[in-house]
């Protein structure tokens, strides 16, 4: 509900899905959806609260001036900076924490991001659409089904409104009784509860903006930004909100149009040999990983420096930090100055293979990755030289979470699934299985799936049919689980038990994956 780019900054981490990984939320679902505490009976009507809010938000930022903001940032135990350039509805945000930086923005309706390795990509903004749905519901005076005034907060001198429309964000807005500004927002994302407070509002370009914003999630991760300077540039330059140029992180040998990767296929997973410093390690070729991930043992052996510290969560909580790897070699390919997440990787595809890392988003984003499981082939191609096979189907991918989400049909339902080469089992959400009428067709007892921090349960089922890109698979077995699959707005994770039926080319540059049925 806050117009400011700073106020609406999403505290969101990319999904990381590993071999045979299901992600389940740590907090209990009931606690996540509980009403805020400390409320008393409401002293106004919902209509009055909406009118108060609208009076405070009657204007939007114009394109007559660029709003320039500099903030002091505290995040992940690190002090940094946060800069915002805003021109009308367009904005560009830059977060800097020590030697690491990333940017996000909106340009003419297109969401974009430059990640910590300098790769720029656009994405549909499916999670932002949830926020927009809730915003419209709150501001729609006729919607009293999805919006409720649930009480007053004496601690914040605010009215508290619950907003929970279908396809929207479940949130609680604390509307200040005097100003009509939102002073606190609690919301649910990935089955985790977030609380954001907004303080010290000031009028900027006719719009009230906070000067201090603090967000804490239910794991205790915290981000706080305090305004240092805010100014208006009356001679706006559209370049202030432009996308930055993208950096290339994968270096190919000269005059080579394809590089075969040093890979072994173990239990359906592509295990690639990666040289880091003077050590050789096994990494998963993992489209389901939202970045490059390395095990802490590699950091220790190579004497790499760590930056920041936070808690992650899948099946349990675990510490994670970041590092910069001077060089990684994958066959004839080189990656230099790579920012990686440091997370313990507990998977062993077989008795003699210990996975020490994941080749995720950056590798897939800067090379066309070709996988043919039937031929035990994995290769990387320079994007500028790639030509899609004439007999392949093209399927659009969405990179909101730095993982390839596609439209698919399972049973009788259409859904959104992630193509995950780092998982050897396919998992669908229980709600999606019910919608597709394939949940009751159980063929075996409950199974256990291991992930970061522990295990979860899943139930095998048989699908009458499954389709991606016009290619149908019939009578396949998949798992069904009532679990968080690592990101919001996803109905399933398609693992290599399904993907092995395809010859695949991942082309993130054009947001496309090319598929054809594998020849046997």
Task: Annotate each predicted stretch with a short phrase.
Residues 15-25:
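Bacterial N-terminal signal peptides
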Residues 33, 37-48, 107-172, 176-181, ...:
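Flexible, processing/modification-adjacent segments and terminal tails
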Residues 65-67, 159, 259:
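Short structural boundary motif marking the start of a folded domain
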Residues 74-76, 150-152, 316:
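A cross-family detector of function-defining hotspots
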